[in-house]
């Protein structure tokens, strides 16, 4: 078959989008939110997720009904090691595998979300399909400080999208972090009574939601459980997702006190958000995006590792009045009690924080990223025809 006939067949098929966002939930969830938005905008779109065998995408992508193609992982060592010596070979292998995927699905555009899946995708797209055209790239950076993969991808990308204006990338368009539609469409007030009944709280309760990501956060767990008596004495109920591998040291339950509901994991974050008046959580990009999308004020406790991006992720919300920052090193039972109780017992202050949190969110981020991807893909097809 000659090149011209291949291109004609290509133009008759739905737009082919490859999403490169494997590894952690912070990369996979935005990719899946964009996939859902793409399908809503164009039911004929063909979506392929790129991932590795070791990432969460092996479970999350099939659950959401999308095709998944696996490549060799290319983790980038932070320090000199044997892995650094193996890096060039791994990169070449991953690029070759990715180019095969892009060719196999006849990709029209690659949308990358950073991490060790995105880097080979950017390089393969720039090199072009086997014997054919280059593939345009759209980069999305969720963190306030861009990682290596997105810094590389942004150099040749058609469009660079970001959660914040100062992520370290040039010529960015601020769109926020893509969040799944079940969260962005959540009406907390309408669902509150059902949500509180689900967890055993009174309809008029003051509810603190505590979570530290899918695996929990031990420092948050220790501090909030140490404040349990003070919170109960102030009439505050607690919904605490402590992580499947963690336990809490709680005082004996008092049937006369507001309930302290401790669970390993929350399958229904929508109900948890609807039940809550205030949250204590980490400040990963995805967490901040979800919490602000639903308009929930929060006390953010940045993870004290990495390059400080979690603190930067929360700063815009905190500066706008939608949250507070507490350093992990300063977290204790006393800190929790002194911070939470004045907030949850002051209606006007809580209402102001709730309003500010709502204004800080970007509930249309997934749709905006999807629109850009389709625009770039259609322009590339038109140019090639």
Swiss-Prot record:
Gene Ontology molecular-function annotations: UDP-N-acetyl-D-glucosamine:N-acetylmuramoyl-L-alanyl-D-glutamyl-meso-2,6-diaminopimelyl-D-alanyl-D-alanine-diphosphoundecaprenol 4-beta-N-acetylglucosaminlytransferase activity; undecaprenyldiphospho-muramoylpentapeptide beta-N-acetylglucosaminyltransferase activity
Function: Cell wall formation. Catalyzes the transfer of a GlcNAc subunit on undecaprenyl-pyrophosphoryl-MurNAc-pentapeptide (lipid intermediate I) to form undecaprenyl-pyrophosphoryl-MurNAc-(pentapeptide)GlcNAc (lipid intermediate II).
InterPro entries attached to this UniProt entry: GlcNAc_MurG, Glyco_trans_28_C, GlycoTrans_28_N
Record keywords, A-Z: Cell cycle, Cell division, Cell membrane, Cell shape, Cell wall biogenesis/degradation, Glycosyltransferase, Membrane, Peptidoglycan synthesis, Transferase
Binding residue positions for UDP-N-acetyl-alpha-D-glucosamine: 24-26, 143, 180, 214, 310
EC class: transferase
GO cellular component: plasma membrane
Matching CDD domains: GT28_MurG
Name the UniProt record assigns to this protein: UDP-N-acetylglucosamine--N-acetylmuramyl-(pentapeptide) pyrophosphoryl-undecaprenol N-acetylglucosamine transferase
Compartmental location: Cell membrane
E.C. numbers: 2.4.1.227
Pathway: Cell wall biogenesis; peptidoglycan biosynthesis
Catalyzed chemical reaction(s): di-trans,octa-cis-undecaprenyl diphospho-N-acetyl-alpha-D-muramoyl-L-alanyl-D-glutamyl-meso-2,6-diaminopimeloyl-D-alanyl-D-alanine + UDP-N-acetyl-alpha-D-glucosamine = di-trans,octa-cis-undecaprenyl diphospho-[N-acetyl-alpha-D-glucosaminyl-(1->4)]-N-acetyl-alpha-D-muramoyl-L-alanyl-D-glutamyl-meso-2,6-diaminopimeloyl-D-alanyl-D-alanine + UDP + H(+)
């Amino acid at each position: 078959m000659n090149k011209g006939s291949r291109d004609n067949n290509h133009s008759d098929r739905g737009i082919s989008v490859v999403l490169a966002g494997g590894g952690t939930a912070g990369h996979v969830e935005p990719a899946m939110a964009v996939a859902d938005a793409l399908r809503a905008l164009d039911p004929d779109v063909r979506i392929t997720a790129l991932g590795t065998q070791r990432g969460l995408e092996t479970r999350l992508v099939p659950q959401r009904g999308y095709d998944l193609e696996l490549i060799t992982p290319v983790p980038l060592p932070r320090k000199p090691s044997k892995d650094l010596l193996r890096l060039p070979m791994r990169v070449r292998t991953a690029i070759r595998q990715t180019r095969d995927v892009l060719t196999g699905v006849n990709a029209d555009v690659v949308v990358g979300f950073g991490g060790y899946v995105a880097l080979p995708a950017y390089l393969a797209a720039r090199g072009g399909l086997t014997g054919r055209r280059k593939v345009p790239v759209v980069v999305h950076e969720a963190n306030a400080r861009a990682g290596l993969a997105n810094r590389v991808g942004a150099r040749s990308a058609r469009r660079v999208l970001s959660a914040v204006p100062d992520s370290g990338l040039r010529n960015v368009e601020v769109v926020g972090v893509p969040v799944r539609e079940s969260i962005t469409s959540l009406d907390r007030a309408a669902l509150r009574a059902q949500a509180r009944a689900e967890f055993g709280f009174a309809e008029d309760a003051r509810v603190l939601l505590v979570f530290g990501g899918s695996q929990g956060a031990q420092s948050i767990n220790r501090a909030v459980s140490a404040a349990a008596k003070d919170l109960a004495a102030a009439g505050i109920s607690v919904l605490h997702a402590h992580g499947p591998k963690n336990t809490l040291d709680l005082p004996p339950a008092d049937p006369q006190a507001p309930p302290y509901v401790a669970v390993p994991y929350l399958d229904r974050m929508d109900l948890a958000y609807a039940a809550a008046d205030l949250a204590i959580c980490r400040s990963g990009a995805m967490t901040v995006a979800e919490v602000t999308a639903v308009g929930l004020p929060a006390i953010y406790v940045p993870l004290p590792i990495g390059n400080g991006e979690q603190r930067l992720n929360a700063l815009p919300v905190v500066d706008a009045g939608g949250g507070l920052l507490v350093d992990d090193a300063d977290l204790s039972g006393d800190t929790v009690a002194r911070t939470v109780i004045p907030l949850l017992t002051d209606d006007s202050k809580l209402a102001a924080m709730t309003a500010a949190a709502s204004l800080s969110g970007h509930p249309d981020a997934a749709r905006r990223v999807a629109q850009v991807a389709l625009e770039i893909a259609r322009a590339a097809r038109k140019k090639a025809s």
